[in-house]
């Protein structure tokens, strides 16, 4: 087992990759360590979820839950620099506008926002806000828990693609290129353990619904991306995170209303 300092180094790499939080200067970064850092992508999601939930809880003292949710969403975007939202938009533009695999991948690399990407972004943000606002009607405090679970579990789902799917982008300058190295069972185990620990925050039946629902989404997206482009790219990982986050809020709303 690697030392705690090595593990901390990997976590800080993951944090630096997925957020705008600066890494300490002593952190050692290379392609191999970035690939190993994928084990902590879920934990970085927990950090983002906790900070977003903190913003929500503070704002709740002065504004309504629906407005506090907007501030929490803004906080998460500022923390990540819209990293995953950008991936969602690029994926929507590529898969919506390209007729061949090559064209789809080329469109994804284009930094300009197209109509498909704009629609995907607007719909995704509206869905997040509406689902969390509906959750707040049952219990305003449940939104904080939803934010933590949503940000954690969605990143676990996205990062798990590295273990089983084929990386297809040939762009050497891509920020996610080092992730193309296949994830080891050790990385996947720690990733899944993070998800399991976060699920202890809710009841067994609620956790079971989330597991089955997110597993179904993961299988469906893997099938769709393989059919469309033959594997995954950094952009489709971002799209997966955003879709899984929305589904997580939807499932929490369903089970919250049922149990």
UniProtKB/Swiss-Prot annotation:
Subcellular localization(s) per the UniProt record: Cell inner membrane
Catalytic activity: alpha-ribazole + adenosylcob(III)inamide-GDP = adenosylcob(III)alamin + GMP + H(+); alpha-ribazole 5'-phosphate + adenosylcob(III)inamide-GDP = adenosylcob(III)alamin 5'-phosphate + GMP + H(+)
Record keywords, A-Z: Cell inner membrane, Cell membrane, Cobalamin biosynthesis, Magnesium, Membrane, Transferase, Transmembrane, Transmembrane helix
The keyword Transmembrane helix is assigned to this record: yes
GO (cellular component) term, any one: plasma membrane
GO molecular function, one term: cobalamin 5'-phosphate synthase activity
Transmembrane segments: 37-57, 58-78, 118-138, 143-163, 195-215, 237-257
Pfam families linked: CobS (PF02654)
InterPro entries documented for this protein: CobS
Cofactor(s) needed by this chain: Mg(2+)
Pathway where this protein functions: Cofactor biosynthesis; adenosylcobalamin biosynthesis; adenosylcobalamin from cob(II)yrinate a,c-diamide: step 7/7
Topology with respect to the bilayer: Multi-pass membrane protein
Similarity section: Belongs to the CobS family.
Protein name as annotated: Adenosylcobinamide-GDP ribazoletransferase
Highest classification ranks of the organism: Bacteria, Pseudomonadati, Pseudomonadota, Gammaproteobacteria, Alteromonadales
């Amino acid at each position: 087992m690697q030392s705690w300092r090595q593990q901390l180094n990997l976590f800080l790499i993951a944090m630096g990759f997925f957020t705008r939080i600066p890494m300490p200067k002593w952190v050692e970064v290379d392609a191999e360590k970035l690939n190993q850092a994928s084990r902590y992508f879920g934990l970085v999601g927990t950090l983002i979820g906790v900070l977003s939930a903190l913003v929500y809880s503070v704002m709740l003292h002065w504004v309504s839950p629906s407005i506090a949710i907007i501030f929490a969403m803004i906080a998460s975007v500022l923390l990540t620099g819209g990293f995953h939202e950008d991936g969602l938009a690029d994926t929507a533009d590529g898969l919506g506008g390209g007729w061949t695999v090559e064209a789809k991948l080329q469109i994804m690399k284009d930094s300009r926002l197209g109509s498909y990407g704009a629609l995907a972004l607007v719909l995704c943000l509206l869905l997040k806000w509406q689902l969390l606002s509906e959750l707040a009607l049952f219990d305003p405090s449940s939104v904080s828990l939803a934010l933590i679970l949503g940000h954690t579990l969605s990143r676990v789902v996205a990062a798990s693609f590295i273990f089983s799917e084929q990386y297809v982008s040939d762009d050497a300058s891509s920020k996610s290129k080092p992730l193309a190295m296949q994830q080891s069972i050790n990385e996947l185990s720690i990733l899944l353990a993070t998800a399991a620990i976060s699920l202890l925050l809710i009841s067994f039946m609620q956790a079971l619904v989330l597991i089955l629902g997110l597993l179904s989404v993961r299988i469906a997206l893997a099938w769709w991306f393989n059919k469309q482009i033959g594997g995954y790219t950094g952009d489709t990982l971002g799209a997966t995170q955003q879709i899984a986050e929305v589904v997580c809020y939807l499932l929490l709303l369903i089970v919250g209303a049922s149990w």
